[in-house]
A protein has these predicted regions:
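Active-site bordering "gate/hinge" segments
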Residues: 1-297, 301-304, 313-314, 394, ...
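Dual-mode signal for accessory low-complexity, basic/Gly-rich regions
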Residues: 114, 270-443
Length: 443
């Protein structure tokens, strides 16, 4: 066992902490105990740059005294520390204002089935082996082409995590997961200047990742194809978001449908249940029980059971992403999304990105986005971009130093196709997305 505590030990600590909270005057309480450990190594130009070992543990206790809430945390699991942390949370609660929406999620909503989602796969990797993998990755990139003349480094990361959540409804559950990754970033140059790009892979199970040599070679190829980038004339064009950036595009939709933004009136999709936000041929599903996915879980951060569901069906919003608190604020029922969304799937209309390029004809393929020019209150969207200009369905040349702009509501409704090319490493399976028109500002 890699961890310092067994699952049973963490469950006992959690139950004991909740008992302390009740004995100290809490009306109700919830606690989570977590442990993590891992290592990260990075190399640059064949030399070791960094070796890090990480081992953490934490307790977060939230207490409710009537409708008052207090929260405290500690990294010390000793009896005295548990008592002091509970006391601190109780003291905080007594000085906070009452909140009618504060409290645990309903007991009837607690998860009753906690199965194995195959998310935990130890990688017993020595530091020397991790360094060798990073060097192999970087060397594969540097050997791809003589124009790859520098490196920002390659890295290997392993992470092992376990977590226990419990509350005074009597719910308590344990889950564990792993997260392993390999990445590489290099620089290429020619007579027109320099460009950089990167690639990585990650998985719960290290055997499922691409070989380090393939990751390095992909990083090099992505960098080389950016050489001799130029701008494009300002105008209105179709824009194809590569799958690597399409996840972020749909992420703005997820954020706008999230309870916190909705009850604070800081979303451009307020009161959107039953309204069309995507074309009729698109649906967005949440699938929280997918095996070996980083975001899979049978219960959310409040112990509420998670369920597969449509968030958007045939273009129409069917549900939000709600915790019990945001649900109470909105007069609704929690959707089991305390802690965020779980594995989103956007259906596809085309087999490949090449099919979407043909559909687009002439326009912009975006592979990188820069800046924070997204206003989630108004839905205004304006970001720096780089990618490729496309003519007659074929990539013509790389582009940079451009800005793409639009309104998210219009952009979502103007989607005309989604490719079946989502990356395996992503919890949100969103393929390349083609938008019929956006403003592109170039030279």
């Amino acid at each position: 066992m890699l961890f310092n505590h067994t699952p049973d030990e963490l469950l006992r600590l959690c139950g004991h902490t909740l008992d302390l909270a009740k004995q100290s005057g809490a009306t109700s309480a919830e606690a989570d105990f977590s442990e993590s450990l891992g290592q990260s190594v990075s190399v640059r130009l064949g030399e070791i740059e960094q070796i890090e070992f990480q081992q953490d543990k934490s307790l977060d206790i939230t207490v409710y005294v009537g409708q008052r809430k207090g929260r405290a945390s500690t990294a010390d699991f000793s009896e005295r520390a548990l008592q002091d942390t509970v006391k601190a949370a109780i003291d905080i609660a007594r000085y906070t204002a009452e909140d009618d929406c504060a409290g645990l999620a309903d007991a009837a909503l607690m998860a009753t089935h906690i199965g194995d989602l195959d998310r935990y796969h130890e990688w017993d990797l020595s530091t020397e082996s991790a360094i060798d993998l990073a060097k192999q990755c970087e060397q594969a990139a540097l050997s791809t082409d003589k124009r790859i003349e520098n490196s920002e480094g390659a890295s290997v990361h392993t992470g092992h995590y376990q977590y226990v959540y419990g509350n005074t409804h009597g719910f308590a559950a344990h889950q564990q997961s792993t997260h392993h990754s390999i990445s590489c970033s290099v620089v290429a140059s020619d007579e027109h200047g320099m460009q950089r790009d990167y690639w990585y892979d990650s998985s719960c199970r290290h055997e499922d990742m691409d070989a380090p040599e393939l990751i390095g070679k992909t990083a090099a190829e992505r960098t080389l194809r950016r050489l001799n980038s130029r701008s494009v004339p300002t105008g209105s064009y179709p824009v194809l978001f590569d799958t690597t950036v399409a996840v972020g595009l749909i992420g703005h939709l997820i954020g706008a449908l999230s309870g916190g933004a909705l009850y604070r009136q800081s979303s451009f999709l307020i009161d959107s249940i039953g309204k069309q936000v995507l074309p009729e041929f698109l649906s967005l599903r949440e699938e929280p029980h997918i095996l070996r996915s980083f975001r899979s879980t049978y219960f959310d951060a409040e112990g509420v059971a998670t369920q597969p569901r449509f968030v958007v069906k045939d273009g129409v919003v069917e549900g939000y992403f709600l915790s019990s608190y945001s649900a109470k604020k909105l007069g609704m029922k929690t959707t089991g999304n305390a802690g965020g969304a779980h594995n989103l799937y956007l259906n596809h209309t085309h087999a490949t990105q090449a099919d979407l390029l043909k559909e687009m004809g002439t326009g912009l393929l975006v592979t990188e986005l820069m800046g924070q020019g997204v206003n989630t209150i108004t839905g205004d969207y304006s970001r720096g971009a780089a990618g490729f200009w496309v003519e007659n369905g074929v990539i013509a040349y790389p582009v940079q130093e451009i800005t793409i702009a639009g309104r998210l509501k219009d952009m979502y409704r103007d989607i005309i196709g989604v490719a079946d090319d989502a990356l395996r490493r992503s919890s949100n399976q969103i393929g390349s997305v083609l938008v019929s028109k956006m403003t592109v500002a170039g030279n």
